[in-house]
Structure formats: C-alpha cells, structure tokens
Amino acid sequence: MTAIPNVVDIESSSSSLCQETATETVTVERGSSDSSSKPDDVVLLIKEEEDDAVNLSLGFWKLHEIGLITPFLRKTFEIVDDKVTDPVVSWSPTRKSFIIWDSYEFSENLLPKYFKHKNFSSFIRQLNSYGFKKVDSDRWEFANEGFQGGKKHLLKNIKRRSKNTKCCNKEASTTTTETEVESLKEEQSPMRLEMLKLKQQQEESQHQMVTVQEKIHGVDTEQQHMLSFFAKLAKDQRFVERLVKKRKMKIQRELEAAEFVKKLKLLQDQETQKNLLDVEREFMAMAATEHNPEPDILVNNQSGNTRCQLNSEDLLVDGGSMDVNGRIEIE
C-alpha cells in the first residue's frame, strides 16, 4: 500500500518551492537588467517553474481529498464497483444504491479479503455509522447520497456520525437493532433448514438400521435352522428317510382330506338337489290344492280309459268299487 504524504510536509514543500521560484525570478530580473542577452529564454524558464508549482498544488489537493475518504468507504466502494463480485454484491439499476445478493458468500470471502474479518453484523453497523439507509426490507440494499456508481469523488462528502448526537444515536441504534435482528433471521433460516435435513437423514438412517437388523436376524435364524438340520443329519443317517416318509404321509393326508372334502361336497350337492325336488313337489301340490278345491282327479290315458280317483269315503257312498291297488274306480 502506498503511504499518503503528510499534509504539513506537502505544505512546507510547496511554500519552499514558491520561495525558490520567487528568488530565481528576482535573480533573473537582475540579470536581465545587467545584460539584455536571451530575454525569451528567461521568460520561458519562469513560466515552466510557475506551472510546476501549480501542478504540485493540484497534487496536494488530490492527496488531501484521498485523506478525507476513510479506508472503510474506499474498500466498500472497490468491492461494489468490482464487476467480478457482481453475483455477490453489485450496484442497483439506478447506481444510487448497492445490493448484497449473497450475505453468506459476502461474509465468507469478501469481508476477510478487504477487512480481515467475517462479521456481517459489524459491517452493517459500520454502514449505519456512515449514514447508509436500508432501502428494501426484504433484501440487503443500502443507499447514501455520497455513495453512487461512477461518482467516486462524492465519497469525501460522507462523514462518520458523531457519537454525541442523540437523534443520530437513536436512529443508528434502532437501525442497528433491526439489521441485527434481520441478520440473525437470515442466519437462522439456513441453520433451521440444515437442522431439518439432518433430522430427516437421522430418521432415515435409523429406519435403515432397523431394516438391516431385521434382515440380519432373519439370516441368523435361517443359518441356525440349517446348522441344526445338518447336525441331525450327521448324527442320524436315517433322519432323511424319516423326513421323506413324514413328508409323504403329510402329502397323503392332504390328498385324503381333499378327496374327503370333494366327496362331502358331492353328497351335499346331491342332498341339496333332492331337497330341491321335494320342495318343488310340495310346492306343486300346494299350488294344485289352491287352484282346485274339489278332490284330486287323476286321468290315466295309458289304457285309453278315463279313471278318476276320488276320496274313498265319498265314492263308496255313491256305489263305487275298489280295485286291487286300493283305488276306487268309476266308469
């Protein structure tokens, strides 16, 4: 970093230069009175020395202007004005304010590079102390009349607020508190999301662990059964024969049970069919009784004769005769 010359040293050097210029001017004038040779060269020399004095004076004012701009304002202006950092911080479309788009990236990378710390809240407090105001409550946008894009010369108009001013202190404290609260909210949101993600990952990991433990337990049980089977097989060579015989008996019992169920179902179907026929006969008889209240008459057409079966008591009274089968016939 280039050191800025002291104002007192510059003033003393400027005054001494002016005195030397005046002395040389008098000397030249005296020489001109003594000798009239080359007057134009003397005039040009005096003019060049006067121009050098003016240039030195302008350089002093530029250095003085730089001295009035604090390092915080100069560095902040450099950060915002750098196009490389536009995704993180940049000028607004009007270039009368600047916007911090990514507060996390700004704190982690830019602040340590220029200010050697990562405290975003401290940076906000510095802005408040220089009179910057928050433009939009939903984002980190700040504005100051002396802080505009392309107008670096206005930085000398920005002054740090006096600590003795009550009104300024109240506004600064209120703004600082609000910005700190907003900063804490901004910092809490990613932390909450991260905590939720970690909690979900923990629950998923626990669920996976339970599933793996169940699978391991199942595999252990199967291995124990297999080891027990092989142990029995090694001790008793006829174990397989008994196992096969037991299996066959089980299959036979299952077949017999299936055959029994099949026969039972068949008998049930036959019984159901018989019951249906009986019910149908009873229903037909009841229907005939309801439609013909006189005694039932049976007409037999096989022999070509018409025979009517009546009640025995009524026909015997009327002089009917009974055949071998016990039926009463009327010709």
From Swiss-Prot:
Assigned GO CC terms: nucleus
Highest taxon listed in the record's lineage: Eukaryota
Motif (Bipartite nuclear localization signal): 245-265
Subunit structure: Homotrimer.
Entries under InterPro entries matching the protein: HSF_DNA-bd, WH-like_DNA-bd_sf, WH_DNA-bd_sf
UniProt keyword annotations, A-Z: DNA-binding, Nucleus, Phosphoprotein, Stress response, Transcription, Transcription regulation
Name assigned to this protein: Heat stress transcription factor A-9
Pfam family, one: HSF_DNA-bind
Spans annotated as Disordered: 14-39
Gene: HSFA9
Bias type Polar residues, positions: 14-26
DNA-binding region boundaries: 69-163
